[in-house]
């Protein structure tokens, strides 16, 4: 199983940016934690972080050709603005879980709307880095469940 983890703008500044909201743990720590859990579950995980909307769209489109089973995406600020990312996700038709470190529904009014949630199978928010692990497990369970269903 192959899962792509995409992180949007400013997530490379985890541990530096607004630690009262996002904590003091760094982006490198996040990647290490996800890799550890993925390795236990024998899942291949690839990571991508960009501050640029077009590069995120390009990566989503490449995921189609690279045959990823799932995408975990934290679009960060693009959550609330990017129809382009929504359209890219819809076009590749890959199982997608949206993740947010903070609970966007408890933040400023403009952060409460998510375009990505219009496509994502589920949204996990407010659980910190654990949300990524929950997303990983969600995709694993969904894909494995689909395979078992197809085998019957």
Located regions from the model:
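Short beta->alpha junction loops
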Residues: 46-54
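Mid-chain, well-packed structural core segment of small domains
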Residues: 67-105
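Extreme N-terminal starter segment of soluble prokaryotic enzymes
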Residues: 1-4
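Short, electropositive alpha-helical surface patch
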Residues: 55-71
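A charged, well-structured terminal subsegment
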Residues: 125-152
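Short, hinge-like loop/turn segments at secondary-structure boundaries
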Residues: 63-65, 89-91, 113-118
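Glycine- and acidic-residue-enriched helix-capping/strand-helix junction motifs
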Residues: 14-28
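Short beta-strand elements at the ligand-binding edges of bilobed clamshell
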Residues: 110-129
């Amino acid at each position: 199983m192959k899962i792509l983890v995409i992180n949007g703008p400013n997530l490379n500044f985890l541990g530096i940016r607004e630690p009262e909201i996002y904590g003091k743990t760094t982006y490198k720590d996040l990647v290490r934690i996800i890799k550890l859990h993925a390795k236990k579950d024998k899942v291949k995980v690839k990571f991508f972080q960009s501050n640029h909307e077009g590069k995120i769209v390009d990566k989503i489109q490449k995921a189609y050709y690279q045959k990823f089973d799932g995408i975990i995406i934290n679009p960060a600020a693009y959550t609330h603005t990017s129809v382009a990312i929504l359209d890219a996700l819809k076009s590749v038709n890959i199982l997608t879980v949206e993740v947010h470190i903070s609970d966007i529904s408890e933040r400023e009014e403009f952060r409460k709307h998510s375009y990505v949630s219009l496509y994502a199978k589920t949204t996990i928010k407010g659980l910190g880095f654990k949300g990524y692990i929950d997303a990983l497990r969600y995709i694993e369970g969904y894909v494995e469940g689909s395979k078992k269903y197809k085998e019957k």
